[in-house]
Amino acid sequence: MQKVTLDEIVGLERYEKIRDVFRRGIIELKKHRRVSVGDRVIFVFENQETVLFQIQEMLRAEHITDIDKVRFEVEVYNELIPGDGELSATMLIEITDQAQIRPELVRLLGIDQAVSLRIGNQFAVPGVFEGGRSTEDNLSAVQYVRFPLPIEARLAFCDERQDVRLAIDHPQYQAQAVLSSETRQSLAAEL
C-alpha cells in the first residue's frame, strides 16, 4: 500500500476549507473499517486515506507548518499503513469512567499478547503490536497492531464462505467479533 507523501499534505489554511468534506468521507470510510470486540475494545483498520486524515488533523491541532516537522510527522504516521500482505489497525480500549482508567488498564495488561485474526478454522494470525506501548505494569489505551497474513490466509480471507473474526483471549477479557461482509470487502481490496 502506498505511503502518504509530503506532496499530499495540504497547508492549514487550505485544509480548513476542505476539512468538512474530507472528514465526512473518512467517517463514511471508517464505518466499514471499525470493529467492536466486546464492550471495551474497538479496532479501526488503517489505510493510506485514514492515515492522511490523522496527519492533517494532527497538524491542524498542533498548528504545525514547519516543513521539517511536517516531514517528521508524515514519517511517523506512515508506520500505521499496512505493508504488503498485512492488515493494520488502531486498537482502542474504551474506558469512560475516569476513576477506572488506571485499574482497568492494569487489569488488561497483556492484552497485546491475546489478540488474533481468525480466518475460518484454518488460520489464527496473532496480532503484532507496536513496541513501547505497554510494559509489565503499564498499558496504553491506544495500541497499534499488525496482522501479517501469509498468502494462504489472504486467499481464505477473501473467500466469503470463511468466517473472519477478531478475537481477544485474555484472562480478564474474552470476546470475538465476526467481520461484516462490508468490512471484509473494504480490507480485501487492499490485500
Language model features with spans:
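Long, contiguous binding/interaction regions
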Residues: 1-86, 95-191
